[in-house]
Structure formats: C-alpha cells, structure tokens
Amino acid sequence: MEYEIKKVTMFSNIGLYDAYFLIDYKNCQLNKFGVEHLAQEEAIKRGLKE
C-alpha cells in the first residue's frame, strides 16, 4: 500500500468539521484536505493512484 485517505472529525473555534488526510507512505508525506476528492486528485498527481 503506497497511500491511504483517512477521514477525521476535527474541532476548532469554528466548531466540528470533517478533514481528509492523504497519508503518502511512498514519499513519507502527510497532507490535510477539506474535501475527499482533492485528496484523491493529489494522490493521482503523485502517481499513487490510477
């Protein structure tokens, strides 16, 4: 497995919200996105997903 996308519920001063983390095991990177499709697009750009 080269990557995974995890959905987490976070809390801040604006309240509760969902965030999606792209965990890139191949390149040892972690990125946070507000919507899942942006995380998927980034995985495609990095060559992790076809």
Regions found by a protein language model. Give the residues of each.
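Short N-terminal "domain-start" leader segments
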Residues: M1-F21, N31, Q40-E41
